Amino acid sequence: AHGEHLLELGAGAGRNTPRYTGYDKITLLDYSRTQLEQAHAKLGDSPRYKFIAADVYRLPFVDGAFDGATMIRTLHHMSDAPAALAQVRRVLTGDATFILEYANKRNVKSMLRYLLKKQDWSPYTIDPVEYLPLNFDFHPAAIRQWMKDTGFRIERAITVSHFRVGFLKRAVPTGLLAWLDSLAGLTGNLWHLSPSVFIRAAMLDQTPAVQNTTKPTGGLACPACRAELEDTPPEIRCPGCGRAYEVKDG
């Protein structure tokens, strides 16, 4: 995808960030300041990057701030996935592209384990399963419904990690296994049977959630009262509610 300003949700230490060569600017967002400090150390002080420590349920951006977003290896930590997706939609323009990865509960391994009575939760029920604290697997049908309800239209799906089984990793050469995995991923538009699924989505309508006629500037907004903020280090003070947000080491 190509565009002006990408929002990388759950950016962590910036491992994936260099891959997004099609965007002029990238805002890395993560709940962990420590992770963002690692990303900053890796990516440097380039004006192309902005580093924001924030809560995905209260994104600190104006409506329609970005024309692209990614959320990879992140949704599975969300106890309220629809609320998180709604926030993502709010900050995207009408022509944006959204890349989402989710953990699929209805995968072959979980179905076999359920059949053999080695797990007590069903991979077929629509509700998420919390297999560890704040670690969720989701049913594909639930993801499709949530995406539609929050204003996204799924364009393509790719399944990955089909062969996440110990004996296969030991018995089959890594290169061959990766090739077979990429081949199997082409069936993603037909069925989701792998533990991890990538989705490319567009917007259901071609306008932001709230009309925004400006370009995707990545503009900041107070997460408490939604007033627009000026990026004025070393402290950003909200003109609406008076809250102050610290700018520390970039």
Language-model features, listed with the residues they occupy:
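Conserved class I S-adenosyl-L-methionine
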Residues: F98-S122
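Short catalytic micro-motifs in class I SAM-dependent methyltransferases
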Residues: R73-H77
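Acceptor-substrate binding/catalytic loop of class I
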Residues: W121-A142
